[in-house]
Regions:
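Extended, charge-rich alpha-helical interface modules
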Residues: 1-135
Length: 135
């Protein structure tokens, strides 16, 4: 099956797979991650688009998706401890802000590369709330 996707979604997916390839240690899971990453990178390389590393948004997606991974890990740890304190609330809120940044990066890729499909979000813009993002 072949499905057309917004280009920003493809780059985002590759960045997530890159992070998974670095952070997952289970050999069976890594095999699947590497297979998917190889297929998507080859498909991207077969286009006329700049390499992933040449995209201005690439480093930003790696950073944001890496932070999301860490936040989700931290949330699951606190959830397991049934610890729903201020730290939990701040981490949970940071997911919205990080996802807003992620959506903006993906949209920037879609626009700059002339993607025929562009994902739109309908969520409220939280604006200056980014100050509460974890480092």
């Amino acid at each position: 099956m072949k499905v057309e996707l917004p280009l920003g979604d493809v780059v985002d997916k590759i960045s997530i797979l890159q992070i998974k390839s670095e952070r997952i240690h289970n050999a069976d899971k890594l095999k699947n991650v590497h297979q998917e990453l190889t297929v998507l990178k080859a498909a991207w390389a077969d286009t006329d688009h700049p390499s992933l590393e040449e995209l201005p948004e690439w480093a930003g997606l790696l950073e944001v998706n890496g932070k999301l991974w860490t936040v989700e890990d931290d949330l699951r740890l606190l959830e397991g401890q049934q610890k729903f304190d201020e730290s939990f609330v701040q981490l949970a809120r940071s997911v919205y802000f990080l996802n807003d940044k992620r959506a903006a990066l993906k949209k920037s890729i879609n626009i700059s590369l002339g993607s025929s499909l562009v994902e739109e979000k309908s969520y409220q813009d939280y604006g200056s709330g980014a100050g509460s993002l974890p480092d």
